[in-house]
Every structure is written in C-alpha cells, then in structure tokens.
Amino acid sequence: MGHIKKGELTQEEKELLEVIGKGTVQEAGRLLSSKNVHVNCLDENGMTPLMHAAYKGKLEMCKLLLRHGADASCHQHEHGYTALMFAALSGNKDITWVMLEAGAETDVVNSVGRTAAQMAAFVGQHDCVAIINNFFPRERLDYYTKPQGLDKEPKLPPKLAGPLHKIITTTNLHPVKIVMLVSENPLLADAAALGKCYRVMDLICEKCMKQRDMNEVLAMKMHYISCIFQKCITFLKEGENKLDTLIRSLLKGRASDGFPVYQEKIIRESIRKFPYCEATLLQQLVRSIAPVEIGSDPTAFSVLTQAITGQVGFVDVEFCTTCGEKGASKRCSVCKMVIYCDQTCQKTHWFAHKKMCKSLKDVYEKQQIEAAKHKRQEEKNGNPNVSSNHVNEDQPEAEEGITQENSIPSDSVEGEKEAANDTGLASAQDAPTGPQLSEE
C-alpha cells in the first residue's frame, strides 16, 4: 500500500473501524495482522483508526494501534484534527499521555486555529490541558545523561533521569507535593543528587529562553522546581529527616488564620529569582502577585499554577489542604472544613490544623444553621428549589463526626510547644493523627 486516500477502505479496514468502536483488542489485533489493513488508513472524513480509538476513549486499542505503527501526528482529517485533539476532547487523561509519549505534536492547529490544549480547554477538559501543557519528552532529559563535548561525565546520572522526569511532568506544582516526591525516592533525597538535578533544570530553563521558539512557561516551571530543589538541599544538609522539617515549615500557619506564610514567601521568592527579567510571563506574574497582601487571594501558588498548567481556579473541584492534589475527598470529621487525599496528608497537616480545627468547626456549624434557616424560608415561600450559595445540605452534620474534645490527642500540649518554633522542628512522622477522616 504505497499511498493512502480518504474513504478508500478495504473490507478488513472497514471491519477494523467497527471493531474499534464495539469489538475487542484481540479482534483488532487479528485484523491488523492482515496484509489488507493499513494501520493509518483514512475513512471518508480523513480519520485514522487511532483517531477513532482516541475519540472513543479506548486506551488499550490506542496502545495496540501504536505498537503496529500508527501515526500519532497524522494531520489528514478534513478539519485538521489530530489523534491528540480527539484524546483531549474525550477527556481521557491516560490516552492523552499515551499520544504525547508516542510523539504527537502539541502545537498543530485545526481548521479553526486551535491546538489540542485549546480545544480541551474550550470543552472544559482542564486535566487534559494540564497534561499537554506540562508534557516534557523523556528524550530531552536523557540528553543530559550522556557526556557532551569535552565532558568526561554526564551532567545527570542516568539513574536520576526517571525520578526527575516524574517531577518535571507533574501537573501539581504545590511545594509540599514536590518535596514529598523528592522525599519518597531515596535516589533523589540526597543533597549531591539534587544538586545535579537542579543544575540540569537551570540548563533546560536557559535553553527554553534562548531557543528560537522561546518557551517561557516551561522555563518558569523548570526554574520553580529548581528553586524547590535548592530549598530541599538546604534542609538536607542540616541532617536526617530534614525534608520532614521543610514540609512542616511549608504547612505551618500563622496564629490569626492558619495561612501558611512561609509557603507563600517561598513561591514569591522563586518567581522573583527568575533570571530573565524581560520575560512577559514573569511580568504578568509580578503584576498579579505583587499588589496582593500575604494571606489574601489570589495566592502566589494559584497564580503560578494557572500560568504554568493552564488549570483555572473556578473549576468546581477540591484540592488537598496538605499537598494540593486535585480531587481530594476526605474531610476532617470534626470541622468538615478541610479536605485531604488520605490519612497520610491529614496526619502530616494535623500539627497545624489542630490549632484551627475548633474555630473552623464553629464556622461550619454557623453555616449549617444559616443554610437550614435559608431552606426553611425557601419552603415557606413555596420555592424550595431555588439554588443557594450556602454549604451543601448533603454534607454530614458536624455532630456525626468525632467530638472536638475526644479528637485532640493527649500529646497536643507538646504539639503546641513544637508549633511555637517557626520552622516546626519535629518530624511529620511523629505528628499526632488527630481526628479521623470522613468521606465527603
């Protein structure tokens, strides 16, 4: 099959397109082994089998087609859509990632001038937008694992490439999350290893700014992660388990409202240290953050996240109070006002939250009373279905959780003494667990 024309499908190719929609991977594999099937055949609209599989959200089918040589960057669709665009429109994060790993081009535009990320944003698939905007090909990192020019050793030991790539491609830029990713990997949790990593990040940042098609967003992300790595090195040099100390410092809230001032200052400092002061993105970030008083909205983290990942703040989704991970669903059983990924994050944050838990519980109960009063008024007026901005009535009542008195561990007094230290010197592993978590 030397050339491929739209709509000129063999019987087996027509069967393949049907199997992609309704059949099994095994059936598709059998058809792909036929000499009468071209893996990049085009239907009458210029769609390849891979585009069909991506649009229908068939992950294993996509992997099979790619193994058989499917072109992830095919641009023959009548409206200029690519497999990556269909994956992003479907909202399937795994397929979007697979397409990117297969070499799908991210800057191709369709007939209305939109890229895959822009199409995903248009239909509200913000997770896919973040994945595309944060993708960094492993090959670009592997370049630094080989000696270049007169170098006798590579700038990055090959064993560090995998763990570092995981952090580079993360869509969660919360400093606590980055420190956690470093801490949980023995290869990275070493001052010398992190030193090599942050220097490579700085080189990538420089390359992004000096290349012909300048990439300020990626440069800022590399610089920011480099700054977090350097902060990790400072704490690691103080002794064992000092990354736990850094995490506690980032989470420690001020007495008045629990706002993590140190975390805010670290992020602002990282942005301020960006070495290319003429960059448009830097100027936008500074204009958005500088006038804001520490503790007010928007926070430096929210502004930076929106600029780098493309995620928007108004999306109706919860984030973990500890690590910023999206989709957290476990509420503190006492105050029901803070949300976590799991008990690990809840335990890590308890040293800071225990000082605010009771006051937050009071706020929650007042909201419940106001919501109940508002609901009764709606029913009295004969209009019970009018939407309200108050706390969701479906949330469990505060009394159903563990009572505040029983929730404070016996060592809470010791914890209060620890909290007086600005950097929170105790290990997060020693932190009391506090109240249990409840499903949202």
UniProtKB/Swiss-Prot annotation:
Single GO molecular-function term?
A: zinc ion binding
| Any matching Pfam family | Ank_2
Statement: the UniProt record of this protein carries the keyword Zinc: yes
Q: Which UniProt keywords apply?
A: ANK repeat, Cell projection, Cilium, Metal-binding, Repeat, Zinc, Zinc-finger
Q: Which InterPro entries match?
A: Ankyrin-MYND_dom_contain_2 (IPR052452), Ankyrin_rpt (IPR002110), Ankyrin_rpt-contain_sf (IPR036770), Znf_MYND (IPR002893)
SUPFAM superfamilies on file: Ankyrin repeat, HIT/MYND zinc finger-like
Q: Where are the ANK repeats?
A: 45-74, 79-108, 159-188
The leader peptide range reads none
Please state where this protein is localized: Cell projection, Cilium
Grouped into one coarse class, the protein's main location is other
Q: Does the keyword Transcription apply?
A: no
Give residue spans, biased composition: Basic and acidic residues: 371-381
One CC-aspect GO term = cilium
What is this protein's record name? Ankyrin repeat and MYND domain-containing protein 2
Per the record, the zinc finger regions (MYND-type) lie at: 320-357
What is the protein's known function? May be involved in the trafficking of signaling proteins to the cilia.
The gene from which this protein is expressed is Ankmy2
Binding-site list for Zn(2+) 2: 332, 335, 353, 357
Q: Which residues bind Zn(2+) 1?
A: 320, 323, 341, 345
The residues forming a coiled coil are none
Q: How does it assemble?
A: Interacts with the retinal-specific guanylyl cyclase GC1.
